[in-house]
């Protein structure tokens, strides 16, 4: 597996993965627009030309927010999400970011365990943040 910065050739596969993994997915056009966003950093995990996972963030001015992370269902439980989060943290730190914040569904125990293992701590809660189904988001933060 290789972790690369998102390029135009990856956008269609990332959009397909977004539709597969989320009830309220980003459009292909929205993902493509991130290529020209100087505040954005998106990474993809690629195996044999196939995007098996991705992660996206935005930074303003030295604080970063994780926008999305997803791994194809056929490739889960192999450490891909952890590798993507770790690579993102490293890249953001090199770019001068001092922290990374994210939201996670309060019921997403596997993700919460992974983020805790990677050094994220609870920073707050957003009631009814998610739709389909309606659910609170936990705000997690890691100092880089």
Question: Where in the sequence are the language-model features?
Answer:
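Short glycine/proline-centered loop/turn elements that form peptide/ligand docking sites
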Residues: 85, 108-111, 128-133
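Terminal substrate-recognition subdomain of acyl/acetyltransferases
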Residues: 136-144
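Conserved active-site tyrosine of GNAT-family acetyltransferases
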Residues: 115, 120, 140
